[in-house]
Swiss-Prot record:
It is an enzyme of class 2 (transferase). InterPro entries: AceGlu_kinase-like_sf, Asp/Glu/Uridylate_kinase, G5K_ProB, Glu/AcGlu_kinase, Glu_5kinase, Glu_5kinase/COase_Synthase, Glutamate_5-kinase_CS, PUA. It comes from Syntrophotalea carbinolica (strain DSM 2380 / NBRC 103641 / GraBd1) (Pelobacter carbinolicus). This is Glutamate 5-kinase. The keyword Amino-acid biosynthesis applies.
Length: 373
């Protein structure tokens, strides 16, 4: 099964964690060199590769005398400002022997939440790939604030699969996949070779927190796999410090854990709405509206809304909740909060009478709406 699925892959997003390329003495140039040679081998076989590389903060924090994780965002930003150039230099030097050039792309969540900037970033990415350049993506930690953080590069790598229109996500970790218990403390822990569907039990099994040098534990990796597989992209979590790990994976060796893509996956736009675009508000709806949206695939009309929370404009994402406040959908609002306060509970035929204009009958059109599974 794995070999058959991998035979259809053309474009790969490879996420490299801090725990893989960072050792006791700083950046592990031997590992970076080994991974670069692996990627060059894939490129020579006709694959396209997008690299998501952590390590900027871990590389730069030593210059500031920081032990462990930087405790504040300003310290993290300062460490990233020092470390990002060194990280890129390491990748540049590692790819040079095989005649490959690298290009840096730094992103914040806002870059992907804004559809125009998302498409601009995609155009840049596609141009780099067209010219045989290896894009190296990282979060723009020097300018990011809490509200627009990706949180970790596992999450960023999952969103990059949509940005890059990739066929496969490989997350290189310091653990060789998902186990039924922590393999670092339980030698008898059993590894899962294939996960067909990421259930709540699987998510709970991942558990755990990040390491001293990184922010992403197994829980964030499984969450990233869930986001990628919902877009139809298979995901492999594997030990990135194994020699020749990438060519071995693409040859079909049963390394790590393979999370299978969801057969009925989201469109690119709905994946963007669901995961890239941050919610600015909340709409509480009655049971009739909930059934229409969640069970019948209808648009959300103003008549079913009875309460509004948050501050949002037309075009912002909002969460849609039932009467008890449980989120069951997310979508893009066709009207601002101020406008909705005037038309909620009314029939669509009254919108133009109340506002003096009308963008449409729907508060959230079904084409701009994602129901939570």
């Amino acid at each position: 099964m794995r070999k058959d699925l991998l035979s259809q892959v053309k474009r790969i997003v490879i996420k490299v964690g801090s725990g893989v390329i960072f050792g006791q003495d700083g950046l592990d140039l031997d590992v970076i060199g080994s991974l670069s040679r692996d990627i060059c081998a894939l490129l020579s076989q006709g694959y396209e590769v997008v690299l998501v590389s952590s390590g900027a903060v871990a590389t730069g924090k030593g210059e500031l005398g920081i032990v462990g994780r930087p405790p504040t965002i300003p310290l993290k930003q300062a460490a990233a400002a020092i470390g990002q150039s060194r990280l890129m230099r390491a990748w540049k030097d590692a790819f040079r022997p095989c005649g490959r050039c690298v290009g840096q792309i730094l992103l914040t969540r806002d870059d992907l939440a804004n559809r125009r900037r998302f498409l601009n970033a995609r155009n840049t990415l596609m141009t780099l790939l067209e010219y045989g350049v290896v894009p190296v993506i990282n979060e723009n930690d020097t300018v990011v604030v809490e509200e627009i953080r990706f949180g970790d590069n596992d999450n960023l790598s999952a969103l990059t699969t949509s940005l890059a229109e990739a066929d496969l996500l490989i997350i290189l970790s310091d653990v060789n996949g998902l186990y039924d218990s922590n393999p670092k403390t339980n030698p008898a822990a059993r590894k899962f070779s294939v996960i067909e569907r990421i259930t709540e039990d699987i998510e709970q099994m991942a558990g755990g927190a990040g390491s001293v040098v990184g922010t992403g534990g197994m829980a964030t990796k499984v969450e990233a796999a869930k986001r990628a597989t919902l877009y139809g992209v298979g995901t492999i979590i594997v030990d990135g410090r194994q020699a020749g790990v990438l060519p071995k994976l693409m040859a079909g060796e049963e390394l790590g854990t393979f999370f299978l893509p969801v057969p009925q996956h989201m469109t690119a736009r709905k994946h963007w709405i669901s995961f890239s675009k941050a919610s600015r508000g909340k709409l509480l709806v009655d049971e009739g509206a909930r059934r229409a949206v969640a069970e019948k695939g209808k648009s959300l009309l103003p008549s079913g809304i009875f309460s509004i929370e948050g501050k949002f404009d037309r075009g912002d994402a909002v969460r849609i909740c039932d009467a008890e406040g449980r989120v069951f959908a997310k979508g893009i609002a066709s009207y601002s909060r101020q406008e909705l306060e005037r038309i909620m509970g009314r029939n669509s035929s009254e919108i133009e009478v109340v506002l003096g204009y009308k963008y449409g009958d729907e508060v959230v059109h079904r084409d701009n709406l994602v129901v939570k599974k």
